[in-house]
Design a protein with these regions (language model features):
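Viral virion structural and adsorption modules
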Residues: 1-85
Length: 85
């Protein structure tokens, strides 16, 4: 990996870790997209740290959303997570 590349990993406790790498040019373009998309928001995404938090929270959001969709099939308390900052 080169400086600025991104590594995304999902680890299951007691299991294996799956990892993908994204090159720095892709990260720069993705950040530019989010900066433009959120430019009118009260807290726009302008930095790598803000983009990282946005991406990790996006992934967590989808995992929790999919889990909570199973309420129709099984009975349990809806799940939540603590967002990264």
């Amino acid at each position: 990996m080169a400086t600025g590349d991104v590594t995304l990993s999902v680890a299951v406790e007691g299991g294996v870790t799956k990892t993908v790498a994204i090159d720095s040019a892709t990260r720069v373009l993705a950040l530019a997209y989010e900066t433009a998309r959120t430019s009118t928001f009260p807290d726009p995404v302008n930095t790598d740290a803000e983009w990282q938090a946005l991406m990790v929270n996006y992934l967590a959001d989808h995992i929790v959303l999919n889990a909570n969709r199973q309420q129709e099939v099984v009975s349990y308390t809806p799940k939540t997570y603590t967002a990264a900052t």
